[in-house]
A protein has these predicted regions:
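A short loop-to-beta-strand scaffold at the N-terminal edge of the catalytic core in hydrolase folds
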Residues: 83-94
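Conserved alpha/beta-hydrolase
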Residues: 122-142
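Membrane-penetrating hydrophobic segments
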Residues: 1-15
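An N-terminal hydrophobic leader/cap segment in hydrolases
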Residues: 13-80
Length: 152
């Protein structure tokens, strides 16, 4: 093999190594941001945003109040142990004479009462029993990372 071919092969190998390391690092950062229990520092200020409302304090306060009202309603706190031993929590609201059951999974880095406080009344008024699940790695459920319901 000529010197020129060796240099080209070395350059290509070095480039591939740098690209691989960069891809690994970026992927790790993105996965950690998406799945880790703790919210990244740069996202702390987004915690109180409600879709379409910006940071309107009245809307945020109203949604939080509805969440507190939902939590205060009669319900049963439930817990299961996943196949990997992690304890997962939920909140069962039974509607006598229900016609359907809703399993409600809160959004990314949120909570059941924050996401469903404003719409829970609709479910119950329409003859639904509802299980508000707490995602793995969030709130009272165990685990170090979110599973988005895929591993439960």
């Amino acid at each position: 093999m000529s010197k020129k071919a060796l240099k080209a092969a070395g350059f290509l190998a070095g480039t591939a190594a740098v690209a691989g390391a960069a891809a690994f690092t970026v992927t790790k950062i993105l996965v950690d941001t998406a799945l880790d229990r703790d919210m990244p520092r740069v996202m702390k200020n987004s915690d109180n945003l409600i879709s379409g409302s910006g940071t309107d304090p009245e809307k945020i306060e109203s949604a939080l109040k509805k969440g507190d009202e939902l939590e205060a309603m009669p319900h049963e706190d439930v817990e299961i142990t996943a196949a990997d031993g992690i304890k997962l929590k939920g909140h069962w609201y039974h509607k006598e004479g229900d016609k359907r059951v809703v399993i409600a999974m809160h959004g990314w880095r949120s909570s059941w009462k924050k996401d469903f406080g404003t719409c829970a009344e609709f479910f119950l008024e329409n003859d639904c029993s509802v299980l508000f699940a707490e995602q793995r790695g969030q709130n009272s459920s165990g685990g170090d990372s979110m599973g988005f319901g895929l591993v439960e």
